[in-house]
């Protein structure tokens, strides 16, 4: 799904762009960017982010964040193993949240007063900045104004915006990293309150969550996403409730059972269908776009009906009620390791550098001098005073705040530009574009993916055993014939067999540890017992009994937690093994009914 055009008011967007003016003008020279960041850091200057309120960018140098020993170029950079291409990113500073330091807010404006003056104060001068070495989020600037965000705690790189104008219009509202548990972001979806309270109180196990969902099946929850419109979430609870919505209402029994097998095969554990997100049509049929699934650990996933894929949606009920469908809007903008993405069922990062050859389509961008580029003209065009003016009396007037924007405002998308080659022009221009791509590849080595994104690169001994076990169970004809893989790999996992194999390997590990550390049992052998008749001996025995009872309770809690962690670890290993086996092969997708299947035969 495509984002809305902006999440902030016109005055806030223009103020943010004015704060980024010098970055827009000096973006071609890395030394100028570093000098500008150094000068801002010396003055303790911070730039308020347009959305959400309270966030600001503290300009800090690279050495103050990562240390003087950190590398600024190449694969040894803090983000070198995460970014898809070998592009040099420049650190702008750290992102901080504070409710005390806010920008100067103007009073309410009318449509004519939205033309803010040029003397607005778009910077914040902070007296005390938190230690940048302990900051979690780092803002980075790439080529052609691409904006990136590095989450140092999770080791994840986010592709925030395709330009500084995009960053000014959207801010951090769709950055997944700001909605973590430590931020305590308030819930957006709060109604109906009795349903929300029951869901939050029974999110510890999948059985309790299913019981609550079945209690309210048929109810509609307005699921809210930050900055986007509200979508209806129809609660189901059971698989049979899916047959009342489109397109599952048109599916045969065998086809529907294959779909349920696909859900279990993709999540590698028992699955609960929480509900569907879509639209209620005037005909009375609910049109489903996404199916919300819950796995054993009460983590949420979505099944895209049109793409026939399953990906991660939220880590918990609270996160689902906070971010809504944010991951669907930001699909492909999260860059991490292949094994972790396979375990979490995250959408792999989609390389945004594919459009760079389009920018260099005439082979002249690298030859043009920096002084002759039209960055100043672009900046003046972006902050023009009539850009966000709303005139209701002009019904035929269109501006850049409309959903369908002009070419100048979304020129980053090649599909919208009229000079992008269409299908009829591809054959005659194929040779020219091939020569152009070769020229671009020779000019810069940062085009094309250079990172080996493969599950096989991060193999562990546990994962290798899971891959071998999975390869032995998969029917050979399913891997050779993609048409037979509608319901997945047709593998039914057995926890008992995997427990036996893990116990065998763990026993060997325990024996090795005991042989290496024989002094663990010395204390029990050399302890001298007290005389049974003395008062001190009775008190000591009672104290020992109480300690043993408390230790037994703690041991049971630890075993229960370890059992849950082991079960979840087993599920994650299954997902990574499944991704490793299917790497380089067609992805299994279930068969879904087409519009022809539910239309009358005369149509």
From Swiss-Prot:
Pfam families: US22
Region (Disordered): 496-536, 549-568
Parts forming coiled coils: none
Biased composition (Acidic residues): 496-513
Biased composition (Polar residues): 517-533
InterPro entries: US22-like
Family: Belongs to the herpesviridae US22 family.
Protein name: Protein US26
Native organism: Human cytomegalovirus (strain Merlin) (HHV-5)
